Regions:
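Loop-to-helix entry and N-terminal half of a specific, functionally important transmembrane alpha helix
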Residues: 54-56, 252-262, 396-398, 420, ...
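N-terminal signal-anchor transmembrane segment
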Residues: 2-94, 115-122, 443-447
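A membrane-periplasm/extracellular boundary helix in multi-pass inner-membrane enzymes
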Residues: 173-186, 268, 285-343, 363
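Transmembrane alpha-helices of multi-pass inner-membrane enzymes
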Residues: 41-42, 277-285, 420, 436-448, ...
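Long extracytoplasmic/lumenal interhelical loops at the membrane interface
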Residues: 212, 216, 338-409
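Alpha-helical transmembrane segments of multi-pass inner-membrane proteins
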Residues: 113-117, 142, 159-290
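Hydrophobic transmembrane alpha-helices and their immediate junctions
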Residues: 243, 248-250, 278-290, 405-444
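Aromatic-anchored transmembrane helix interface
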Residues: 77-84, 106-112, 116, 126-148, ...
Length: 506
């Protein structure tokens, strides 16, 4: 494996990520600050591939479990809150003269953000909403600028692909290493409950764990099970697409990470992530493969493999359900199926955890049907932050994405958000960004349980990077391959230029 140039480079990137996390743990925020400075320096020196890699590592750092990487010291919030903005603006200044059509179709979201600005003026916390709008806009701007015209920069393209593979490997292998230590997930769950609802929420979480026999939702190395689950689902899809459309053959490191991701996703007990993973198999086989031609024998092996996978999964689920109601326990998230079945139907049990958030979003919509109640804020934020002076940010939990958009931005925002989605899919389809379309659809699917679409300061940033940066990287590699084939047929390079020399492992 290490003789392969790509895997050799990815292993080096993995080692650097491990060293960075270790340094961040013991330097009290100095390492993330240095990462920001390195990213800015790389952007201004023209090494935008390294800059976007630093840009991707910052939100990844935010979501690592506080038991593994405690965020202690004043430098942490400075690096994490303003670091992404600094690197994004550096990329903007350094790439102002580098324009082209090969970029992500993000322009359609601008009208939606403008409508969110209008609605936030009369929302619960206008200052917080405006700061979150700026943060979200700069985050998307950094992704858009950093990935622009990657086909002209094959070395940057390779660096980004290696970093993405190393990040997914770190998350999956690191989470596997946490399986023998359930206390870490236990302590992480209690700490999250304490942060969200104080001592009352922590006591309630503890009682629920006791009732379920001391079991807790598996977090791996992330700060929450609902953070690990969608990341694993999108990592599964990206690794599969990378293996099929870039490597174009079965590769053991890819297969190993894919197989390790599935049982850990089951351990998180995230039903939405399981649906996202199932949707990834469906979309890749019935959409992406039909849009991107691959060898017949590879396609046949994929079909056989998917059939065997579905058959084994169904048989295993049936066996576990017959033996000890394992599937019912997983779907209902309870250890006593009989008692829970007397209170709720299966559909009620599966939607009960999100129903309150959906009802609350509809309450916010009725408060201001036209423009909503403010971008990424809620009424309870105002009560929790009362008397704390100038507040620039506040944590929030939202439910299903469509209802959240309706509650935050009203009818106008919902219509403009639908316009953004339509423009994204139409433009991406015209540009033949088929893997990006697949990954973006899975990003939307992962937001049907706990919406993180507008949360660049949380798990949403990692999902955006895996889905959009990861998908666009693969599409750009395929674009390069089509261009090379076109040049070979014509006997020349387009525009009279010599073809760029592809680096080893590309």
């Amino acid at each position: 494996m290490f003789k392969d140039p790509f895997y050799k480079g990815a292993f080096k990137a993995l080692v650097l990520i491990v060293l960075y996390v270790v340094a961040a743990r013991y330097t009290y925020g100095v390492a993330p600050l240095l990462l920001v400075l390195v990213g800015c320096a790389a952007a201004f020196s023209g090494k935008s591939g390294r800059a976007i890699c630093c840009y991707m590592l910052l939100p990844f750092t935010i979501n690592i479990s506080p038991m593994i990487l405690p965020k202690i010291g004043i430098l942490w919030p400075i690096a994490l809150r303003f670091g992404t903005m600094a690197i994004a603006l550096s990329l903007c200044f350094s790439a102002s003269n580098r324009r082209g059509r090969n970029c992500l179709p993000f322009f359609g979201i601008v009208p939606f953000l403008l409508s969110a600005c209008i609605g936030s003026a009369t929302g619960w916390l206008p200052m917080v909403s405006y700061m979150k709008l700026v943060n979200y806009f700069v985050f998307l701007l950094g992704i858009w600028i950093g990935t622009q015209n990657l086909q002209e920069r094959p070395r940057d393209l390779l660096v980004i692909r290696k970093t993405l593979f190393a990040m997914t490997a770190f998350i999956i292998l690191g989470s596997v290493a946490m399986i023998p230590f359930p206390t870490i997930s236990y302590a992480t769950s209690l700490q999250n409950a304490m942060q969200e609802g104080g001592e009352v929420a922590a006591v309630a979480a503890y009682r629920e764990m006791v009732l379920e026999g001391g079991k807790t939702l598996f977090c791996g190395i992330m700060n929450h099970s609902q953070a690990l689950a969608p990341i694993l689902a999108l990592a599964f899809a990206w690794l599969l697409c990378d293996m099929l459309f870039v490597e174009k053959r079965i590769r053991l490191p890819h297969v190993g990470l894919i197989l390790l991701a599935m049982p850990m996703l089951y351990m998180t007990r995230s039903r939405v992530a399981f649906v996202t993973l199932s949707a990834s198999l469906f979309m890749i086989y019935f959409y992406t493969i039909r849009k991107i031609p691959i060898a017949y024998d590879v396609k046949r092996k994929i079909g056989v493999g998917m059939t065997l996978f579905i058959a084994v999964t169904v048989l295993a689920m049936a066996a576990f359900e017959i033996r000890d109601d394992a599937v019912s326990k997983w779907l209902r998230k309870t250890q006593d199926v009989d008692v829970d079945a007397q209170k709720y139907s299966l559909m009620e049990a599966m939607t009960s955890s999100r129903q309150g958030l959906m009802d609350y979003s509809m309450y916010e919509y009725r408060r201001n049907p036209l423009f909503g109640s403010g971008f990424q804020v809620a009424a309870y934020n105002r009560e929790m932050l009362k008397g704390q002076g100038l507040v620039l940010s506040a944590s929030i939990e939202k439910g299903v994405l469509p209802v959240m958009v309706l509650g935050e931005t009203g009818i106008v925002g919902a219509v403009l958000f639908a316009f953004f989605l339509i423009s994204f899919y139409v433009t991406a389809s015209r540009r033949r960004l088929y893997v990006t379309i697949t990954m973006f659809t899975l990003l939307l699917a992962s937001n049907m349980g706990e919406a993180s679409f507008f949360s660049p300061g949380g798990i949403g940033s990692v999902l955006w990077i895996l889905a959009v940066c990861g998908g666009f990287t693969i599409d750009t590699i395929l674009l390069n391959e089509r261009t090379v084939r076109f040049s070979a047929l014509r006997g020349e390079w387009p525009c009279g230029r010599l073809p760029p020399r592809a680096p080893k492992g590309f």
